Structures are given as structure tokens and as C-alpha cells.
Amino acid sequence: MCNLISAGFYKIKKSRVFWTGMVLVNIWSAFLTVQAHFNSLAETIPYTFEDGLFVIETIMILVIAIFVSLFFGTEYSDGTLRNKLIGGYTRAQIYVSQFVVNAAACLLIYFSSILVSGILGLFLMGAEGVSAMKIVVYIVAGAGMCITDAALFTFLTVSVGTKAGASVAGLLLGFSLLCGAMAVHDKLSQEEYMYIPKTEQGGDISVITEDTELMKVPNPYYVFGAKRKALEFLLDINPSGQAVQLAALELFRPGAVIIYDTALTALFCSLGVFIFKKRNLK
């Protein structure tokens, strides 16, 4: 299987899809970091480089969906998988080696974006007040998210069986997971209490000044109890939910996230091998 992985890395080195994705992601990372810097100047908010370090996370699922579907999907169209079978490799070896190559390529794109954002952000905004341990934990969690995404879309590509179909299905799934994650995160971000102006009955609250008295009232949109636990679970187990939390610097359960990523990666790999064994390769 080492030969399969080595051959896969050689293809990555020659892949236009891989290099295009890496360049575009790095450009976007640099742009977001510079934007965070100018926001700190305009709003007089003491931003640090970590504020622009993980914002790229939210689009990584889309980048990985496109890359895996195009790169791995090409293996179907050019007969490479069939040739590997003829060469004496088992279907399990072929699938696992392809996943390893896909995951490694996605990690290279991810780490390159972190490196660009980190160096640029450190130069522009400094590192005062930054927690090195927090950054390390977040980077590890982000890497786990990328590996899980690679496992998911490798499985999806095998399930669909065509490059074009896998690309469309991957983007649709990626957007769905991202939109769902943002909706759940928005619900969980509601404060338990809200403050409204305290006025006499029928009083005018159209004008609020520094002297206006505020009263604390329960927020009707705050989610609590079992429903909140369920939403937290959905956010943590969804790779895009992890990305949204990382981008907001609000990953409160990193241990659980890493466990979920490990379990999902194993699940998608197992299902992928099972389906690939049933595939009739042309």
C-alpha cells in the first residue's frame, strides 16, 4: 500500500486542482487577515493575529469537497482504479491509500493557510495576550476537521461514482452542512437575558440616552435544557459546526470534537471500503 500512497503523492504534486486550491485559499487567508487588521484600526478594537487565523475554516469544507471530488473522481474516469486492481492490490488497499492521499493534500492546504495567516497576522497585529496552548488546540481540532471532511467526501465520491456527480453532490452537501451549522450556532449564541429600556406604561422609548434605565428580562430566544444539549451535540459533530466555532474562537469542547472526528473518520472509511468492494469498475 505504500507504493499506492507514493504514487498518489506524485499525482498530488502534478495536480492543477491541488495547486489552484492551495493558491486561492492562501490568497483568501491573507485577505481576511488584512481585513481583520483594518477592522481593528477602524473600530479601535485590540485584535490579535488569532482573530484572523481561523476565519478560513468556514470555507474549508467547500474547498475539500471540490478538491476530493475532482481529484479522486478522475481516478474513475481514466481507469486508474481498474489498473490498480489488475496490478494485484485489494480494493481495501486502494480505497484506504486514496483516503490517506486525499487527507494529506487537504492538510497541506489547511496548514499553508494557517501559516500565511499566522505570519501576516503576527506582523500586522502582534501576539499580545494570545494563548499559545489555545492556538495549538485549535490547530489540532482544525486538522481533525479537515481529515473528517476528506473521509466524508472520499466516501461520497465512491458512492456517486462519477466526477461530475460527486462535484455537484459534494458542493450541495457542503453548503447544507455549513448553513445548518450557522443556524445552530446562531441559536446557541443567544444570551440568556436581554436588557430593554424601563419606561412607564405608554412611555416613549424611541429615544435612549445614557441616563435611560435598563431592566434585565429573560430572552425568549435563548435555548436551554435538553434542547440546548442536543444542539451543542449537532454543532460539535458537524465538521462545519466545528469550523464555525473555530472561526468565532468559541470551541468550548475540543476534546469531544476530536473524539467525534475520529469516530466519523473511521465510520466513513469503513462505509467507503464496503461500498467500493461492491463497485463494478469499468
Feature locations, PLM:
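Structural detector for helix-capping/boundary residues
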Residues: G79, S97-Q98, R279
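Transmembrane helix boundary and interhelical loop/hinge segments in multi-pass membrane proteins
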Residues: V68-G87, R91
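Alpha-helical transmembrane segments of multi-pass membrane transporters/translocases
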Residues: C2, M22, I237-K282
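Membrane-helix interface/capping residues of multi-pass secondary transporters
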Residues: R16-F18, R91, K163, L281
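Secretory targeting signals
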Residues: F18, N26-F71, V96-G170, L178, ...
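Aromatic- and glycine-rich beta-strand/loop motifs that create alpha-glucan
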Residues: M1-M22
